[in-house]
Amino acid sequence: DGKEIVTSCTLAPREGMSIKTHTPKIYEMRKGILQLLLASHDGDCTTCEMNGKCKLQRYARDFGLTTNRFATVSKKAITDNSSIIVRDNAKCILCGDCVRACEELQTVSAIDFAYRGFDTQVVPSFEEKIENTECVFCGQCVAYCPTGALAIRNDVDKVYKAIENGKYVIGMIAPAVRASLQEEFGLEDDIAMAGRMVSVLKMIGFKKVFDVAFSADLVAYEEAHEFLERLEKNEKLPQFTSCCPGWVKFAEQYYPEYVPNLSSVKSPQMALGAIIKKYYAKEIGVNPEDIVLVSIMPCTAKKFEAEREEFNGDVDIVLTTRELVKVFKSTGMDIKMVEPEPFDRPFGLSSQSGLSFGKTGGVLGSVVEVIADKVAVKNVNTKQISEGTNLTEIELENGRIVRGIAVFGLGNVRKVVDKLKSGELQADVVEVMACNYGCIGGGGQPYPNDVRTRARRASILRETQSVDVLISPTENFHMRQLYEKYLGAPLSHEAHETIHTEYKHRRRIQEEEIDILPLPTDDEEKIKVSVCLGTSCYTKGSYEILEKLIALSNNEEWAKNLEIKGTFCLENCGKAPNVLINDRIVGEATIEKIKEVALSEIREKQGDTEVSKSNL
């Protein structure tokens, strides 16, 4: 309309508006902004994770910026290598994409902007290391970062070291990897990509390569029986899938009341790892300690999952798809010319359902396939009820309707779970994937990892499924042999010992306590009172309790020995608000309950049973 230049994100459209998006003035302004960004950016592109994929690099090339007219002002390099997600603030251009992905898409808010002006940074909560925050390691911040300021820990060297040390290296490949790896090698719709991956890994030094889709069949089979048992007993419903480690950590942190509802069946990665180390090692006569199991996944959170104490080293190394690309390219081989090889038996056969685990709806669909093999199903109907959320209604012959929900994206998940809690939505079984479109959109997938690319990967995976002769996990005879030889029956004691686990609520932030009213007196005289200020307790009144405790300490003589602290989680979210008095947790705390317990502690310390009870 001939007005000044305005930002598109702040200008509301109106009827008849005329907009010019590319004029000489706008071109020069964009060019100047790029030059300023380059002047404050780490220009060591050759060793950057994003070299060749960097948006800043691409825009500089598109605008013909071969030199920069501004002097480089280096930012303070703040590198966090503490966890699976590696942070390098020297590469950050403060675009905010990672912050928005974490806050708006995933509703985790593990990172945000801090400080002002040139000192502005993107940092984790309380400037903690990422591993000590509520981060669920979904990797969507990495997927959306345009410059490599956020990257994934590289574990490729561990693989080469294992091969060099003569270890019996076994690989296993997730379904979603075969749908995305071809993007890096100029291949389209190559249904032989899985076989090419097997061939290259064997050339590198892998002894065996298995298909995680096999264990997806196993997990679907076991999980379907677990669901039918819960349905019959009408307990722990709705049953939530537990294949996605980002979702599991999200549930442990934000919805601890639903942790018992998580399926106890391990994820396909961890189930196959346990089977290989426990049974297959004996079959091939190799000490399990000499086996190095390398899992190749589309997901950053799978690295976190493999390191969880519950799984006790079932999987040794996890490589993302991007790391596998580095391995393949470093060999110098033309993957298009590599002859494909089949996955090794006995864990190389899978059904269409097992392959479908790589995309949203796949786990639920596989469970439904098994249910249909076990009980009479009259009709199955699926419809979208909101963005990222599908409802499947399974009508059984006896007239019962089983409702299943498949939801992706933790922001959508939060809405669904909140509606389940309020009763606005009903379901019997819920499939959850932390990343949009499921595993094909995982944080470890190649760049670009946008909506269009994810949709194409889903299409490739469907084409790959279509050539599989087996439809249901029940048809996988190698899986049935595994039950006959080792596991016995679904949900047997042996099955529970091997492919089941348990989860627990966890702290969102690993932070030291904050002194509110510290006391200079000896520990023997103190009563330590720590008030949880985590989200669950905070929303249920813990801050008000803290204020009352401070007033109590100032006004009542007996309370002078209360040393008051703030803490972030007592891992008892289901009974919030929580207060820790010495070593005793007071759940559903009120100021009256706290006074009663504190006076009891004082009597025990002083041996004075005559402490006045009038203060109660």
State where each predicted segment sits.
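Structural motif corresponding to the C-terminal cap of alpha-helices
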Residues: 106, 145, 280-284
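Iron-sulfur-associated redox domains of electron-transfer enzymes in respiratory
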Residues: 1-30, 38, 153-616
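Fe-S ferredoxin-like electron-transfer domains
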Residues: 2-137, 143, 150-169, 584-616
